[in-house]
Design a protein with these regions (language model features):
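Compositionally biased terminal segments of proteins
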Residues: 1-178
Length: 178
């Protein structure tokens, strides 16, 4: 394949037409999907538990997702900006077969005033060729255990032949009650 980035963008455009979803929404989903893939191959994969809307999308194979954020519970890591910055920089530099997706950190925001638990929002820009897609990643702490325990799942992909990321997730029961 001469230009895998161009090919992927073309396929994502076709997928947006097929599903009758705006191309920008598909780019958001794909950017989140690739970030999950990079988390899943990082040394921090066991410190992140996916929860919230992106998890529901991944479980239900919904063809849309209304927000630009994905939510994670962080375990066994301090919730300090300096540590989160180190972790995120490590994750976005992970090698996958889709290294033409590049991420840039745009900023951090404390979210404790908006959430039940302390946390940090990381604002990222995902770049594929000339596209720039804004996504937010919300990290929360405050729960040391989940009942039932988190489960490792293969998450869906937008393009069927792309590698499915595998990550710890909330249980269905925990997602329903959160």
């Amino acid at each position: 394949m001469a230009d895998p980035a161009a090919s992927t963008l073309s396929r994502l455009k076709n997928k947006s037409k097929e599903l009758n979803i705006q191309f920008q929404q598909i780019l958001i989903l794909f950017s989140q999907e690739e970030l999950v893939r990079r988390i899943s191959v990082s040394e921090y994969r066991d410190n992140f538990i996916l929860k919230g809307g992106y998890l529901l999308y991944s479980l239900n194979n919904q063809s849309f997702r209304p927000t630009i954020d994905s939510d994670y519970l962080i375990t066994k890591l301090p919730m300090k900006k300096s540590k989160i910055d180190k972790v995120i920089n490590n994750i976005i530099k992970q090698n996958t077969q889709y290294n033409y997706v590049n991420y840039e950190i745009k900023g951090y925001e404390e979210i404790s005033a908006q959430m039940k638990y302390d946390g940090i929002r990381v604002k990222l820009i995902s770049k594929i060729k000339n596209t720039r897609t804004h996504i937010n990643i919300d990290f929360a702490t405050g729960i040391d255990y989940l009942i039932p325990k988190p489960k490792t799942r293969n998450l869906i992909t937008i393009l069927n032949d792309f590698e499915n990321p595998k990550l710890l997730t909330y249980s269905i029961e925990s997602v329903s009650s959160s």
